[in-house]
Design a protein with these regions (language model features):
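Helical mechanochemical/support elements of P-loop NTPase systems and associated helical scaffolds
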Residues: 41, 91, 95, 166-170
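C-terminal substrate-binding/active-site "lid" region of AdoMet-derived donor-dependent transferases
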Residues: 134, 148-183
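Conserved residues at beta->alpha junctions
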Residues: 9, 90, 162-165
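Residue-level signal for inorganic ion chemistry
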Residues: 22, 77, 163
């Protein structure tokens, strides 16, 4: 069980496959600096799933994961919430090739991959104010991140910025940008 969500055997198996594929692909492509299985589980999988602390049910909602890299946090959330409508965005093609491979390998449905820069996505009418949730981790500072994510969420939508120890300082520095953008 994780944060009140049951982790059934089939879901755990998907995480095992994801971990194995990530380790294998990382030998050929620089997908992540984290290579140790224990660190992959804590720093990638569990950190990704910590988004569930902000929203207890992602099922049926649309989520855009900006700067997804090797699929974090979007794919772990999709594994736990199979009815999540997932869009993964990154500007690095090889990372998206890996994400598509994982989506296919895990037989995940209702997933979309977009090769684009976040700055351009928010200006595109096909993506502006289209998502229930916009999420990013380790992409940029909170002020700039607000400018990238907030244009993507619908009115009353949710922006999740996974930040580390400097979160409080970044939030204070980003208050003006968040207010201007309607967050």
């Amino acid at each position: 069980q994780f944060i009140g969500f049951p982790l059934f055997e089939d879901r755990l198996r998907l995480f095992e496959i994801y971990e194995s594929e990530l380790i294998e692909w990382n030998t050929r492509f620089n997908l992540t600096a984290i290579k140790n299985p224990d660190e992959i589980r804590t720093k990638h999988f569990l950190d990704s799933l910590s988004c569930a602390l902000a929203i207890n049910d992602f099922n049926g909602r649309s989520l855009v994961d900006v700067g997804t890299g090797a699929g974090f946090p979007g794919i772990p959330l999709k594994i736990i919430f199979p009815d999540l409508k997932l869009t993964l965005v990154d500007s690095v093609g090889k990372k998206l090739v890996f994400c598509q491979h994982i989506i296919d390998r895990l037989s995940l449905t209702d997933c979309r991959i977009i090769h684009a820069r976040a700055e351009d996505l928010g200006k595109d009418p096909l993506h502006r104010e289209r998502y229930d949730i916009a999420v990013a981790r380790a992409v940029t500072g909170l002020s700039a991140l607000s400018e990238l994510l907030l244009p993507l969420v619908k009115r009353k939508g949710i922006m999740i910025a996974q930040k580390g120890e400097t979160a409080a300082e970044e939030l204070k520095a980003a208050e003006k940008a968040i207010r201007i953008l309607g967050g």
